Amino acid sequence: MSRIGKRPITVPAKVQVTIDGTKVVVKGPKGELSRELPANVSVSQEGETLQVTRRDETRTSRQLHGLSRTLVANMVEGVSQGFQRRLEIQGVGYRAQVQGRNLVLNMGYSHQVQIEPPDGIQFVVENNTNVIVSGYDKEIVGNTAAKVRAVRPPEPYKGKGIRYAGEVVRRKAGKTGKGGKK
């Protein structure tokens, strides 16, 4: 039995779960998420908990069991609490700001980079160098944060660029010169 898959999912009081065959719909204060689960995995609700079970012991069923449980747990957590990713901007003259819903980045290019958030995603900028991407769908929050980071990933020589909060960038030594002009 999958160690992750057999753990029950607790459903908070303000979250409503609807199961229709292989489709799971989760509604909460932050929004509504739905997902079609694989046919060899089933979800059942007993009171305030959800249990994900697999129908047979084939290899693919065992692989999808833990994945499906984690996806449903992320849906429940997302509509009740939400998710966020923090990004840090390092570099002279690099800054971010929010205009309307869009994130505007000045990253040393000849132009500003505008990123329009998908539905359900918000950008918050703290003191021009910290960006918080928040929303209720963990996958979209992560993809949007990766899109922002891809504008100027951290470079290994000076460490300038956009990085996740807590990300450690491996630094490289620069070129060593021959020793002055002759």
Curated annotation (Swiss-Prot):
GO BP terms in the entry: cytoplasmic translation
PROSITE patterns assigned to the protein according to its UniProt record, in alphabetical order: RIBOSOMAL_L6_1
InterPro entries: Ribosomal_uL6-like, Ribosomal_uL6-like_a/b-dom_sf, Ribosomal_uL6_a/b-dom, Ribosomal_uL6_bac-type, Ribosomal_uL6_CS
GO cellular component terms given for this protein: cytosolic large ribosomal subunit
MF terms in GO: rRNA binding; structural constituent of ribosome
Keywords: Ribonucleoprotein, Ribosomal protein, RNA-binding, rRNA-binding
Keyword Lipid biosynthesis: no
NCBIfam families in alphabetical order: L6_bact (TIGR03654)
Functional summary from the UniProt entry: This protein binds to the 23S rRNA, and is important in its secondary structure. It is located near the subunit interface in the base of the L7/L12 stalk, and near the tRNA binding site of the peptidyltransferase center.
Record note on quaternary structure: Part of the 50S ribosomal subunit.
Sequence similarity: Belongs to the universal ribosomal protein uL6 family.
Stated name of the protein: Large ribosomal subunit protein uL6
Organism: Nostoc sp. (strain PCC 7120 / SAG 25.82 / UTEX 2576)
Upper lineage: Bacteria, Bacillati, Cyanobacteriota, Cyanophyceae, Nostocales
Name of the encoding gene: rplF
